[in-house]
Amino acid sequence: FRGRIYATEETANLCSIMLKDCAHIQEQEAQWKTRKNARAGLPPEEPIYSVADADACLKRFRPCPMGEKIPIAEGITVRFVNAGHLLGSASIEVFLTEGETTRKMVFSGDLGNRDLPILRGKDYVAQADYVLIESTYGDRLHTPCPDPTAFLAKCIRETLDAGGNLIIPAFAVARTQEILSCLH
């Protein structure tokens, strides 16, 4: 891929950290597997992408402010709309104009389901001609945790009072952001 990558400013900032970090981990794992493969007479292992690939990718990013219409090609304009899922998450409105007719397509991944201290709630799209949306959890309701900060504080206090060590695994970016916000 040699084109531009349009992303919200927050997503571009997050990617500058995450892409390189993930590439570094992949390179380390590939080195480990290559050493293991060499002992078994197997070919070397290659990472899916390298730190150099991540750096090249990051140069293609075009950070875009949330809510502004951005022309990307003849007759095609896009606008990022806050999805409220994690910092920088967005639905994207694509405006396709042919002659006097403009159609709007909306693409979205996860949508936030509540206001969090570090996030605004999601913005709603008023109208669209076509909508494509991720729906992994579309068939169920999430029961809200009454007070996640109080629950986390209780767990921390109990662990420290018992002389224990606290480990909080949070593999998803959104959950990590929520936990860090609660701890703050």
Language-model features: locations:
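His/Asp/Glu-rich metal-coordinating catalytic cores
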Residues: G3-E178, H184
